[in-house]
Amino acid sequence: MFRLRDFEYYNRTVFLRVDLNSPMSNGKIISDARFRAVLPTIKYLIESGAKVVVGTHQGKPYSEEYSTTEEHARILSELLNMHVEYVEDIFGKYARERIKAMKPGEVIVLENLRFSAEEVKNATIEECEKTFFVRKLSQVIDLVVNDAFAAAHRSQPSLVGFARIKPMIMGFLMEKEVDALTKAYESEEKPRVYVLGGAKVDDSLKVAENVLRKEKADLILTGGLVGQLFTLAKGFDLGRENIKFLEKKGILKYVDWAEKILDEFYPYVRTPVDFAIDFKGERVEIDLLSDEKRLFDEYPILDIGSRTVEKYREILLKARIIVANGPMGVFEREEFAVGTIGVFKAIGESPAFSVIGGGHSIASIYKYNITGISHISTGGGAMLTFFAGEKLPVLEALKISYEKFSNLLS
C-alpha cells in the first residue's frame, strides 16, 4: 500500500477522506478527538504545498447527529490556526469550481458526504466508480489520501471508489492503525489476551471464534453484555430482570452460538465470577455461586464484580499482547465504572503491547485518565472486523490502487 511519504504534493489537489464523525449535543460537536488524530496528515500535506480537499461524513440520515460540516471546518481552523473554508456542496459545479481555484497549502471542507444518496449504501468498487460523486470529483483531483480508518469496514464511493482511477494513499493515522493492529494480530508473543465487552455481541462472537480457531489468542476475558451472554451459555441463571433485558436487546438469539464456542474452546473463554447489580440505586456485588443471586430476578446487572476484576487483573499483568474492545459495565455511572476502570488500568500497567478500540472504551479511558495503553484505535466496528479476520474494504482498495499505480514510484 502507498504511504504518505511516497509522493510529492506541491501544487497537487488531494482529496483527503477522513472520519470526523463525532458525538454532538445541541448541534455542537463535544469531542475533537478524531480531529486531533488526523492533524499530522493534514499538516504534512499543507507543509508539502498540497491543495487539501477534506471529505467526511457526520451522523446517519434522520439521526440527531446528522448535520452539515460547517462546525467541522471551524474546529479544523482552530486546531490548524488557519482559515479552513466550509464548502456547502459535495461534487456539484460550485464545489468543483472552488477546488479548481485553490492555491497550494489551502484547505477546504466539503459538505457532509452523506448528504449524497450515493454515499449512504455499501457497494462494490465497480459500482462506486460509476457514481456521480467519483466521476465528477475525479475531474478536479490528482491524488486521494485515505485516513478514515474508523470507516474502513465500509465500501462507499468516497472510501473505495477512486482506487483504480487515482493513486490512493494511506494517511499517517491509517498507517499507524494498520501497523498496530497487524502487530497485535500476527504476534507470536504469548500469552495473547483478548478482552471483549460492551454491547456489540455478534461482532465480539466473530472475533472470539476467529482468534481462537486461528490460534491468535490464548485467552479471552469477557464483560459487559458479551460477558452476560457467555455466562448464560455456561448454564448460569441471570434472573428474570436480566433475561428480559437481554431479550429486548436481541441478544438471547446468540446463546447457541456462544455455547458452540464454549464447546470447542471452553478453557480459553473466561466469564465473570461475580456481578454488580443496581440495588435501589446502590452498587451491590453478587457472587454467581451465592444464594444472593436470587436478586438477579429483580435488579439489573450493570457491571462485573470486584473478584472478577482481580482475577482479570492477574491475567492481564502477565500478558504480552492485549486486544480490548468494549467496557465491562455501565461506566457512565461512577459506581458501575469499577470493572471498566479496573480492567483498563490493568491493561495500562501491563508490560504487554496493548490495543484498545471502540467509542465507549475510548470515552472511558479519557473520562478516568487511564494511561499506558500502547495504541488507542479510532475504529470500533473497523477494529472488530479486522480481528474477526474479515477483509476491510478500504484496505483492499488501497492494495488495488497500489497494484494499479505502483509504476509511478519507479
Curated annotation (Swiss-Prot):
Reaction catalyzed: (2R)-3-phosphoglycerate + ATP = (2R)-3-phospho-glyceroyl phosphate + ADP
ATP-binding keyword on record: yes
Pfam families the UniProt entry points to: PGK
GO molecular function annotations of the record: ADP binding; ATP binding; phosphoglycerate kinase activity
Predominant localisation class: cytoplasm
A cellular-component GO term for this protein: cytosol
GO biological process: gluconeogenesis; glycolytic process
Localization: Cytoplasm
Leader sequence segment: none
The protein's Enzyme Commission number: 2.7.2.3
Positions contributing to substrate binding: D19, L20, N21, R34, H57, Q58, G59, K60, R114, R154
Keywords: ATP-binding, Cytoplasm, Glycolysis, Kinase, Nucleotide-binding, Transferase
Residues where ATP binds: E332, G358, G359, H360, S361
Subunit field text: Homodimer.
Family to which the UniProt record says this protein belongs: Belongs to the phosphoglycerate kinase family.
Protein name (record): Phosphoglycerate kinase
Organism: Pyrococcus furiosus (strain ATCC 43587 / DSM 3638 / JCM 8422 / Vc1)
Gene: pgk
